[in-house]
Amino acid sequence: MRTSRSVPPWNVAKQTRTFDNVVIVTHGFGSHKDTAGTVHFAEHLTSKYKNYAVIAFDWPCHGADARKKLSIPECMTYLTLVVDYARTELQAQNIYNYSTSFGAYITLRYLIEPAIRPV
């Protein structure tokens, strides 16, 4: 997860800053959270708009995630955990999503699943 350029991804859980607005970036199949496009998006957004944070994470079997099997339910769990983190730890009032490809598919499933509260 990445909240801004100044907070390394391994320290994000230890931070105490809150943000009114959080953008969750969900990448496509075969990609990962640290692509140049994601980094550029996060840097540009957080430098232009104050009180915004960007969270990027890896789906199962992608990037730094060590899992060997990809499943849609597990992806839904990952997204739910990230949304919950944005709401509780970062105290986000507004949560936005920037998605590509597979990430957009999971996000749309997340939004229409009745058992999961939408962003």
Go through the PLM ranges and name each one.
Residues 1-18:
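N-terminal cap/lid segment of alpha/beta-hydrolase-fold proteins
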